[in-house]
Every structure is written in structure tokens, then in C-alpha cells.
């Protein structure tokens, strides 16, 4: 089991799929990382040699991933809330940000229905 960016990658999966278990790396970026590190993307993680793992670590290190990315996103949201702009207010109230309707739907963002007292 290889450890990259503080994440244990699942040994039985292909490299490009396993890299996606790192927060901030999706399909496209994982394939590009494999290409730039010179690793075949369909190789299983358990079959990687130590130099290949080191090259992948170096390539992943060039990006903001995991805790640093989560922190950056949190800071950006906090900044919006402190500014008092529309998006910040929507974050604060736990409502959708991008113009979706809220009279019906938006249950994921708003949470479960609250019972109305009579």
C-alpha cells in the first residue's frame, strides 16, 4: 500500500483510480499525473516500484491537495461570509448559492423538513 500526500492508496486498484482517493485529484488530473510521472496509468498500485512512487509523490506535491486545499476552500468561504456579499449570506444561511429555486427542492442544502406547529 503506497502512501502519497498522507493518504494510503488502495493497493488493488489501478494507479489512475487510486490517485483519485486523494482530495483534490479527479479523473483528468490523475491521468495527467501518471503521464507526467512516466507511470502507466493501468498499472496496479501494488506493482509500482519505489522510484515510480517517488516520482508520483513529486508530481502530486506540485498541487494543492488534501488538508491544504480544504483549508484554502474554508478560508475562501469565510472571506465571502465576512464580506457580507450575496454568496456569503447564502453560505451563512445554508441555502443554495447559484440561483437554484428554494420554494421547493434544495433539501440537500437546507436539511430535513422542519415540522410546522399548529
Swiss-Prot record:
This is Small ribosomal subunit protein uS13. GO terms for molecular function: rRNA binding; structural constituent of ribosome; tRNA binding. It comes from Xanthomonas oryzae pv. oryzae (strain KACC10331 / KXO85). Residues 94-118 are annotated as: Disordered. GO terms for biological process: translation. Keywords: Ribonucleoprotein, Ribosomal protein, RNA-binding, rRNA-binding, tRNA-binding. Located at the top of the head of the 30S subunit, it contacts several helices of the 16S rRNA. In the 70S ribosome it contacts the 23S rRNA (bridge B1a) and protein L5 of the 50S subunit (bridge B1b), connecting the 2 subunits; these bridges are implicated in subunit movement. Contacts the tRNAs in the A and P-sites. Part of the 30S ribosomal subunit. Forms a loose heterodimer with protein S19. Forms two bridges to the 50S subunit in the 70S ribosome. Belongs to the universal ribosomal protein uS13 family. One of its GO terms (cellular component) is small ribosomal subunit. PROSITE patterns: RIBOSOMAL_S13_1, RIBOSOMAL_S13_2. It holds the Pfam family Ribosomal_S13. PANTHER family: 30S RIBOSOMAL PROTEIN S13/40S RIBOSOMAL PROTEIN S18, SMALL RIBOSOMAL SUBUNIT PROTEIN US13M. NCBIfam families: uS13_bact (TIGR03631).
Amino acid at each position: 500500500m503506497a502512501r502519497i500526500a498522507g493518504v494510503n492508496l488502495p493497493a488493488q486498484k489501478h494507479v489512475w483510480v487510486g490517485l483519485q482517493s486523494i482530495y483534490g485529484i479527479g479523473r483528468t488530473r490523475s491521468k495527467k499525473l501518471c503521464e507526467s510521472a512516466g507511470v502507466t496509468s493501468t498499472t496496479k498500485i501494488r506493482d509500482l516500484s519505489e522510484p515510480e512512487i517517488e516520482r508520483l509523490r513529486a508530481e502530486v506535491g506540485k498541487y494543492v491537495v488534501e488538508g491544504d486545499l480544504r483549508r484554502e476552500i474554508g478560508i475562501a468561504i469565510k472571506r465571502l461570509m465576512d464580506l457580507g456579499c450575496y454568496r456569503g449570506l447564502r453560505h451563512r444561511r445554508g441555502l443554495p448559492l447559484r440561483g437554484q429555486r428554494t420554494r421547493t427542492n434544495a433539501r440537500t442544502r437546507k436539511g430535513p423538513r422542519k415540522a410546522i406547529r399548529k
